[in-house]
Amino acid sequence: GVFLTHGHADAVGALPYFLQNIDAPVFGSKLTIALAKYYVESSNIVKGFEDYHEVTENTEIDFPTATVKFFKTTHTIPDSLAIVIKTSEGNIVYTGDFKFDQSAAVEYQTNFGRIADVGEDYVLALLSDSSDAESTVENVSDRKVAETMLETFLNAEGRIIVACVASNILRIQQVINAAYESGRKIFLTGSELEEIVNIALSLNKLTVPDKELIVNFNQMKKLADDELVILETGNAGEPIKALQKMALGRHRQVNLHEGDLVYIATTPSVAMETQIARTKDLIYRADAEVFEMANSKKSSGHATPNDLKLMMNLLQPTFFIPVQGEYRSLLAHAELANELGIPYKNIFIPGKG
């Protein structure tokens, strides 16, 4: 079977290509399965696949030689799960994307008790998210991010264009809340964003305090600049290219003008620094302003070193395999594991592919 940890495009986007070659059941939480179905159906690569199975952290799936279990993790999308494969030799744990946030909302909370229970049951191997293993700055709570966002929205005099990843449900919820509390309406650009928002709303994973808060294109054009938030996620959930089009006057719905504030609410992907710098330059040339969240608050969806060490201390694995990240991130994670007493001979850094 295929076991999914969460519903972000980078976690489920390859599914249609996989299912094109291998017919296997797909398991995931309710929101994860709903988003997986959306990506598979919209790809037009696989037709008629329906072998989906919803799980919770209390689900146990028995196979002849192993049992698959789960525990809740904190990420920037609800219903995120880590995967535990219980074998006769011990547990094998794959964290998926995760971080720890002690102040997380209920939908995003980590089940620390369950993690400790898995650790007590002996962990043979841990495969853990290495994306932010090199970070020298720890994440702040997302509650602090929400406070900063609201303050920015209240002080902005013109339109606010928020750039974030399409499936970052947590950030979208924060934008919805800040727009409502600052007396603004929201316009969603693009069909992918609308579809993801509708899926999350239908499953009560996203809440809108006023049914008239989200407006269509014609309604947007009638609003004053200080009454509007535009949420831009771009194609394939990548907003930076879309911001460049807005700045150059080439966007099909919204172009930048004087008085606009572009709020970059996404943590740049690895190797995107040059693109971000060029984009900011184009925005300023269009007489707009830029607020980059990453410059004031560190809040990625990935565990920083202290979180990574806490996960290892809770699980106490015999073998450690850092996954997800550039080689230098994997190496940094391996060094953290060694600091905690895991010998290098028990640490394996995999190659890609």
What are the roles of these predicted feature ranges?
Residues 176-177, 181, 200-353:
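C-terminal regulatory/interaction regions
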Residues 1-3, 8-222, 241-255, 274-277:
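His/Asp/Glu-rich metal-coordinating catalytic cores
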